[in-house]
Amino acid sequence: MSRIELAPEVGDDLDRILEHLFAHQGADAPSHIEDIMGAIDVLERNPLIGRPARADLRELVIGRRARGYVALYRYVAALDTVFVLAIRGQNEAGYTRMQA
C-alpha cells in the first residue's frame, strides 16, 4: 500500500471548505470532510486512479455537484508515496497557491 502525505496547506483547504459548508449547509458539514478524506484514502491502494493533470500531477475527483471536490496530488513511485498538495471545490477556479 502506498503512503499518503498531506501538505500542510491541505489543512487550510479543509478549513476553508468546512467554513463554507457550515455557512451554507450547517450540520452536515463534517460528513463532507469525512467523504473527502475517505476518497483520499483510496489512493493508498490505487495511487494512479486520478486523472492526469499538468506535469507529473494528478487530480482525484471526489463526489459531484454540490459535494464535488478535486484533490491535486503527486505520486512518487520510487517512494511509493502520494503527496496531496491541494483540495478545492469543483466550482472553484483552480488552485490559487499552486499557480505561482
Residue ranges of each PLM-predicted region?
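Basic, Lys/Arg-enriched alpha-helical interface segments
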Residues: 1-59, 64, 78
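Enriched for short, Lys/Arg-rich terminal
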Residues: 21, 67-100
